[in-house]
């Protein structure tokens, strides 16, 4: 799929001149009949699709205040026009957040507002034609629902909400996206996005136990389906096999081991990700979340902790309680649910973990704030904790840390370019172009501050970066998991690392 | 003219009222504040106040749009206060508040700032390619209309003065349904006609951003989903709140 040009990486993130239609050809594969039907959608484009689409739009605006208010309130001020990484990377004006919204808004206006019904030309209202539907399919799959635009809009208009609604409308008329819908189906049938069956999962975990023991001499367990464990760990399934995700998983396990926690994974809830959000479906998001509630009940755990994943954490933090709460059967003295970084940082603060920062001295780190964590969730008990927790943990286990340009971090962070259900090979072009702003910011700290690695806390970010940053001259192994850094620096009791450290006469870095 | 103004006012009040009712009654089923967000209700009030008074997000976003937009809105507010002298009766306790020199002269000169702000916004709409791309005819027309309202107002203030005693009688008469004649002035006719148009289109156009901002879930929600369960009526009903309590 290399029939496109990788944009040139400049010194600064610039605003491109418009190139109309430059990404009109980018569309993901359409879902097959059985993917659609498994989620309760029509198998293919229905006969009276216009009517169905309009009915759905009407239904959504009566059930989602965000949708109704956002459709009405945009004043076309243009403040958001240069905020989307896909626009910055592609120059296609329809990737400007307001223009993306307008694809839907013009139809809303035409059919549901006085001005659009009687003066369509004046207010830019348009009929819902096949061409419009094609545009929707194309451009609402060039939005990673990262919410960056919503930070900068004077009314907080969140294009992510519009994209979600658009995708739900397209599902309702039978034009769903293969990648998302196939994956959600797998979660229902197998338990995770990758369709990794229980047996395979058990094998992977066994293999990891051997690896860690070989490495450290400590028998760190990776428990699966252990009834009566205290903690249920729900983590993205990429953590079970992809690089550098898996090193993060090893990190969680070591931290649990070292703090003496009783924990378990679950076969049926072996996936933190929830693509139900990407397709805007409360129904599917709830069904996917229900597995986690069920697993927690079935295993009789007291706490639920989520592994490193961006959108999963948004859903866990912001929606889980709404969707499948209340969690009155869990131990109320812990946050429900909790992020693994909240757990690890808590332990680091307590001093239960022995850290040898020098293990990470060969690297200079920077950190990529995941969009969904940054702008759709929180960690800790104060606003902005989601920015501090990962940085605190990294700085606690590494000596060399540098932040990227503040215009590209924290609440202004750029999406990795692969979120929102775009992490699929059929969207490679938009993914490569969408990573441009992040790549630019990264390049700058690499060249000026000697940064060698970028840490991330999201399965999608990690996969997207390892795949697309090489287009810009970076290497795959420059992307690391935050808990991978913890794993490297953690000196477990009774480990070879401990012996080495205490055996040699140089002083250690115990805190 | 009296008739037109009254109709426009009714349409405005009823139209915006209905919209507000719609916004208020439409549930927000999920917690979607753009984070970092306040964790208390008081915090949300402050966030909203910063948004409405200072245009905080716009300030973060684009200084030019902020300068022009803020200038326009603040001037509009000041000009509005100045206009209160036409509706407040001199015996009212409000009179000293609206008739004092500060309100009146600020209001008078605000007209210039308002027009400058609007011209700035209009210029951007023409000159910045990205904004031109997203603009439809109504977006330009609305700015032009506001500019003409501002300029015609300034004309009456600084160029050809009108008989404001008669104007006041007209306005006071309006609300008592005792219709009086308008002072003769083209500027005044233009001014008032366009205000009529403005009031009429308000509930049917992007001017709804004014009530809309208060209902924007990304700005008005408290960030406390773990502490407090948020559930919309339709979801509770649809899933029978599904929970085996
Ligand atoms: S910043 Fe908000 S109001 Fe302005 S154009 Fe974008 S979506 Fe519309
Ligand atoms: S949500 Fe993110 S990807 Fe979507 S339009 Fe806004 S900035 Fe672009």
Q: Which stretches of residues belong to each language-model region?
A:
Chain A
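C-terminal amphipathic alpha-helical segment
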Residues: 336, 340, 346-395
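Short cysteine clusters
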Residues: 74-80, 84, 143-149, 153, ...
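Extracytoplasmic substrate-binding proteins
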Residues: 171, 292, 322-330, 344-360
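Iron-sulfur-cluster electron-transfer modules
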Residues: 61-71, 101, 105-323, 503-510
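Ferredoxin-type iron-sulfur electron-transfer modules and their immediate structural context
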Residues: 1-138
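Cofactor-cradling patches in redox/metallo enzymes
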Residues: 156, 240-330, 374, 378-385, ...
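Iron-sulfur (Fe-S) cluster-binding segments and ferredoxin-like electron-carrier domains
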Residues: 82-110, 151-170, 378-381, 421-435, ...
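Short hydrophobic beta-strand segments
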Residues: 230-240, 363-374, 455
């Amino acid at each position: 799929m290399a029939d496109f040009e990788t944009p040139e990486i400049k010194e600064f993130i610039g605003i491109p001149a418009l190139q109309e239609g430059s990404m009109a050809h980018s569309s993901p594969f359409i879902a097959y009949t059985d993917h659609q039907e498994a989620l309760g959608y029509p198998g293919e484009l229905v006969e009276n699709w216009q009517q169905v689409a309009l009915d759905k739009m009407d239904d959504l605006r009566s059930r989602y205040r965000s949708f109704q208010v956002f459709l009405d309130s945009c004043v076309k001020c243009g403040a958001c026009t240069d905020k989307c990484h896909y626009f910055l990377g592609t120059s296609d004006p329809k990737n400007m957040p307001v223009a993306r919204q307008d694809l839907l808004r013009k139809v809303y206006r035409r059919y549901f507002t006085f001005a659009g019904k009687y003066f369509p030309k004046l207010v830019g209202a348009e009929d819902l034609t096949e061409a419009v539907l094609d545009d929707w399919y194309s451009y609402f799959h060039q939005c990673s629902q990262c919410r960056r635009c919503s930070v900068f809009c004077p009314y907080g208009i969140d294009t992510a909400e519009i994209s979600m609604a658009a995708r739900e409308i397209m599902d309702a008329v039978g034009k769903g996206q293969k990648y998302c819908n196939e994956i959600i189906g797998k979660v229902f049938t197998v338990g995770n996005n990758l369709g990794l069956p229980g047996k395979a999962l058990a094998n992977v975990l066994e293999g990891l136990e051997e690896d860690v023991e070989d490495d450290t001499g400590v028998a760190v367990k990776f428990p699966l389906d252990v009834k009566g464990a205290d903690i249920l760990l729900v983590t993205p399934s990429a953590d079970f096999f992809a690089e550098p995700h898996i090193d993060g998983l090893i990190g969680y396990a070591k931290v649990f081991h070292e703090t003496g926690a009783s924990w378990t994974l679950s076969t049926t809830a072996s996936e933190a990700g929830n693509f139900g959000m990407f397709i805007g479906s409360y129904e599917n998001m709830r069904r996917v979340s229900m597995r986690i509630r069920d697993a927690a009940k079935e295993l009789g755990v007291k706490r639920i902790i989520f592994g490193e994943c961006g959108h999963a954490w948004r859903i866990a933090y912001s929606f889980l309680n709404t969707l499948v709460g209340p969690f009155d059967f869990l131990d109320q003295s812990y946050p429900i649910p909790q992020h693994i970084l909240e757990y690890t940082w808590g332990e680091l603060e307590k001093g239960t973990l022995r850290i040898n920062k020098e293990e990470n001295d060969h690297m200079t780190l920077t950190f990529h704030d995941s969009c969904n964590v940054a702008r759709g969730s929180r960690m800790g008990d104060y606003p902005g904790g989601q920015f501090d927790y990962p940085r605190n943990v990294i700085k606690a286990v590494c000596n060399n840390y540098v932040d990227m340009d503040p215009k590209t971090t924290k609440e202004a962070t750029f999406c990795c370019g692969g979120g929102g259900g775009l992490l699929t090979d059929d969207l490679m072009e938009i993914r490569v172009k969408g990573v441009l702003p992040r790549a630019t910011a990264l390049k700058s700290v690499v060249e000026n501050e000697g940064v060698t690695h970028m840490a991330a806390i999201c399965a999608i970010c990690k996969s997207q970066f390892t795949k697309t940053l090489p287009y810009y001259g970076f290497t795959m192994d420059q992307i690391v998991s935050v808990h991978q850094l913890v794993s490297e620096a953690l000196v477990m009791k009774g480990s070879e690392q401990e012996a080495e450290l205490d055996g040699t006469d140089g002083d250690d870095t115990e805190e | 003219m009296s008739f037109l103004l009254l109709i426009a006012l009714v349409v405005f009040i009823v139209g915006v009222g209905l919209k507000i009712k719609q916004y208020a009654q439409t549930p927000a089923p999920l917690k979607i504040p753009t984070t970092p967000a306040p964790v208390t209700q008081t915090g949300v009030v402050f966030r909203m106040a910063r948004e409405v008074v200072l245009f905080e997000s716009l300030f973060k976003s684009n200084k030019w749009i902020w300068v022009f937009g803020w200038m326009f809105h603040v001037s509009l507010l000041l000009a509005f206060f100045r206009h209160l002298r036409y509706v407040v009766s001199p015996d009212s306790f409000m009179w000293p508040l609206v008739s004092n020199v500060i309100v009146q002269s600020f209001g008078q000169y605000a007209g210039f700032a308002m027009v400058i702000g609007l011209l700035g916004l209009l210029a951007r709409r023409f000159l910045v390619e990205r904004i031109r791309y997203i603009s439809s005819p109504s977006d330009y027309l609305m700015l032009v209309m506001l500019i003409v309202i501002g300029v015609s107002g300034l004309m009456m203030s600084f160029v050809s003065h009108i008989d404001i005693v008669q104007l006041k009688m007209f306005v006071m008469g309006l609300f008592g349904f005792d219709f009086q004649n308008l002072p003769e002035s083209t500027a005044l006719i233009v001014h008032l006609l366009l205000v009529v148009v403005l009031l009429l289109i308000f509930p049917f156009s992007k001017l709804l951003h004014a009530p809309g901002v208060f209902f924007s879930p990304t700005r008005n929600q408290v960030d406390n989903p773990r502490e407090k369960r948020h559930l919309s009526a339709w979801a509770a009903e649809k899933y029978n709140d599904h929970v085996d309590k």
